[in-house]
Amino acid sequence: MSIVSRTFPAKVTKLIIFVTSQEFNKKGMRVIGIGETVLDILFKDDQPQKAVPGGSTFNSIISLGRAGVPCAMVTEAGGDHIGDITCRYLEENGVSAEFVCRHEGVKSHVSLAFLDEHNDAQYIFYKDHASVSMDGKLPRITSEDAVLFGSFFAINPAIRPVVGGLLHAAREAGAWIYYDVNFRKNHIADLPRVLPLAEENMGLADVVRGSTEDFGYLYGLQDGEAIYGRVGRFCRTLILTDGARAVRVFTPEGCETYPVPAIETVSTVGAGDNFNAGYIYATLRGFPDQTSRIAMASRWSQDVCRQMGNNISPELVASLQR
């Protein structure tokens, strides 16, 4: 497999003429996120710092909404105050909450994120995956749509009939599909049941994105070429991230490597989620090649790492509109 190293252009914003949010609407473009919602409570030195609605796909969709991309979120939440906060947060950031399935008498999920000395997060989740259900309104997906999905929500057997059916409908409609593996250590015991579902998801996707940590848990592999040897059976394009180390993009034509600039971090919560959002944003805006798309993805990821929050900053949003 050939390996090529790329460097980022000095000014990503000069690569193309941006599509405005009005033009997104004219073209009928929409990003549909499918994933869980949680209330993220961030801790530093064991003290709570911030509470904000989150979830992997949710974080991506909020950032895309802030950037002016028409979005909708397919998820579920309790019929409690946290669920109210979640739906309001979606709408405040320009994301449709029409497809949020609310369950009266059920508590919304909560996540505690403890930041270490490197500002990397260790998580404790308070949620019952077996009680999750999806019996609400679902979107009609068309070829004009992009679909982002991932995490355990995408392989949870309790809701697989609904989620799997929606993904197959998206594939048949000709939507562009991006799968974020985001497989956590606490689900290793579920692998015999969920690995076939994860690989089915890969087969439905145009792009698979995962970290070396994800695939270490999923396949017991750390080597990039070995990982692509598994993923490439199902999807032609794999984006492999590795924290602060270089991003690698694998295709049948070979592997390209993109160094990641070093930055001072405040929190790495949402780093991968906003990488996904930036890549999708660049793709929808017609960025011409992987170099420019990965550069924009890294720019979004780094922006969220410089703050205590899950989504891109107003400053980045303003820079996209120039």
Regions found by a protein language model. Name each.
Residues T237, P259-R322:
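Conserved post-catalytic alpha-helical subdomain immediately downstream of the catalytic base
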Residues S2-R6:
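Low-acidity, Ser/Thr- and Arg-rich intrinsically disordered low-complexity segments
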Residues T37, S56, F152, V181, ...:
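Active-site metal-binding loops of divalent metal-dependent hydrolases
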Residues I41, P70-S151, Q321-R322:
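Conserved N-terminal subdomain of the carbohydrate kinase-like
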Residues L64, S211, G272:
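Short, conserved phosphate/pyrophosphate- and ester-handling motifs at nucleotide-, phospho-/glycolipid
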Residues A173, K185-T257:
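Conserved phosphate/ATP/ADP-binding segment of small-molecule kinases
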Residues W176-I177:
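Short beta-strand/loop segments at the ligand-binding rim of alpha/beta enzyme cores
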